[in-house]
Each structure stands twice: as C-alpha cells, then as structure tokens.
C-alpha cells in the first residue's frame, strides 16, 4: 500500500486534480461497462445471425425404395402424398444414382464423398455378433465436416458402417447423436430386441420373445423429431437413415387394416418365426406381402410429412434444406414383389444388380427461397456428389480426396455454371 500524505494534505490544487482524475476514471469505467454489455449483446446477435444464415440440412435415406415406388415417379397402385408434396415444393431429379447396389457401400460413398472404387467399404462384410466392418478412423466423413462447420450432427435409423465401439461407430465418425440399429443385419427385423442410443444398448422388453410392443421405425422417428426440437435454435445436420421398406415386410396392425385385401392376388411368405435365429437376421412370415409393403410405404410417407410439419411448427422450415432419396433399387427379399408394383420403374434390375433398376434412385430437394418449386432436372448425379454439394451450402472446405462434384448450381437454377 502506498500513501503520500504530505502531498495530498498540503496541496489543494493537487487534490482537485486527483478528484477530477478519479471522476474521469469512474465515468470511463461506467462507459466501458456499458459498451462491454453492448458488445456482448452485439456478439450474441452476430452469432445468432451467423447461425440463422447457416441452413439446417436434413438428408432422408429410404432403404431399398425403388425408383418407381413413389407416385411422384409414376407409381400407380398407391400414393405417397407427403413425398409428392415435397417434390411440388422443390426439385425432382430423374437421373440420380446411389453409391452402390447394396446398403453399406452405398452409405460409405455418401458419407465419404468417394465412389466405390475409392471409398473403404465396398460390400456388406458382416461382423459377429453384431455390426459390419468399420470405416477407418482416418476417414474424413460428411458428419465430421459438418461438425467442424458448427453444426449439431445426428443420425437416426440404420448405420451399417462399423460395429458398436469400433472406429466406425457413428460417434467416432462425426456424429454427436445416434439412435437406431448399428447393425444392418439386425435391421431386417422391425420389432428388435434392442436398439442403440449413442453407445448404450437399449433393451426393448416390449419385444421380448415373440412380443411386438415397439415398432422400431416409430420409436426412431420420435427420437428424430426430438433432435429437431432440441436443436431448433442452432444449425443442425440430420441424417435420417430409415429402414423402410427394407427386407422384412412388417407393419403395425392398425396400418395393415387399411390395406388388407386391396392388392390381389396376395402372396404369402414363409419365414423364420421361432428358434435361435428368430429376430437375428432372417425375416418373419407374412401372409399379405402386398398389403404389408404398402403399409410400410404409408408409414415412411407419413414420417416425412411429420418431419416437415415439425419444421413449420418450430418456424425453421424456410431455413432448412431437405433431401429425400434411397440407398439402392428395390429388393426381392422377405416376400417383396417389385414386379407387382413396378418398383424399378422402366428400368432393368433390382437391388444387387448393376443395372439402372439397381442404382437409379429418386432424389427430391426442397430449399425455400433457393430451389425453385415444382421443377425437374435430368442432371446426372450420384451419392458421392452430396458431400461437396452440402459443403457448398454450408461454406465448408472440401478435402481433395473427394470424387464428387457439387450439384449446387443445378439446385440454384444455374445449369450453365454446372
């Protein structure tokens, strides 16, 4: 502590200057505090504006949905009103291609931006007791790029790119949140004994034995809506990897009732309904495969509609880009009948076939204020083009390893630049 009693006590002028200096100092502090508060609020505003400027991105991936399985693409036996509405509000692609003819490599191409000649996962290599061969730790995924750009990242549905806890686990590949099937083999069954919530196995007691208490796509959908609600004030990347209408043909009875007897002649399918392999990969029996298939498409279409309604309810629809597509062509397993529904449209081949019917898939994109409503394009694009397209939308750096080419100019109506 320092003091100068003689100076302060003996010099009135000095005292006046000291008092004046103290007054100026206090006033300066007051203004500084006020300005600091204003700068803090301004920073918050700038941060909020920056987040608002970044569009939310939702990528909905159906599983084994054929080019002809939507009424917007020519389906005649049933309708998909919510997905059709999405097409009317956005752009419909007529020449979009999946990453591969089957699940895991198609997803790998999507998330790495590399075609199947370069991306690590090139087949459905199974790991026991659960999961598939993982993508390596040094893989730079779309989710990691999104996270680096300030996005909350979530995947809901089927993963298939690395068994639980592996380097390919979704939480090790850029996703903040995961809920659903880690193993695509177990995704053959719609009433599973467990699902994964991040790194925790969630046992579904309601599905123990032969019970059918929880229809997994519905539970996953509810968690998807929760993710949107939770992140409504921040930019998010949501990857909805639906298992519909993959493999087993199964739907809740209240939905099946709407379609029973409407698609004759019905075809019965005999599957595995008990024993050690029950709900461990093989499909259950289904007496009315046509009605079951349409019921599943009904559920998928409704879920798309509910996602769009949630965006509207939260007031974020205008700042959200939504893409809808499928991972490959229609399948023939579990009693599925693509010939009856003309699921592959005018094309030859189905899932696993390297023909147009096996790899040409729907793609619909809605982005209010950017993508002109009710438009079509014959621009040729594929799954590995999605990464650079999203990079352009979110102002992200694109790694040189990508094979894809952004189709953002096409979305913006700038075909000449494309």
Regions found by a protein language model. Give the residues of each.
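Bacterial Sec-dependent N-terminal signal peptides
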Residues: 1-52
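Short, structured coil segments at secondary-structure junctions
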Residues: 171-174
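Basic phosphate/pyrophosphate-binding loop/patch that engages nucleotide-derived ligands
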Residues: 147-150, 414-418
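Active-site segment of extracytoplasmic enzymes that catalyze sulfate/phosphate-ester chemistry
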Residues: 59, 67-154, 164-165, 177, ...
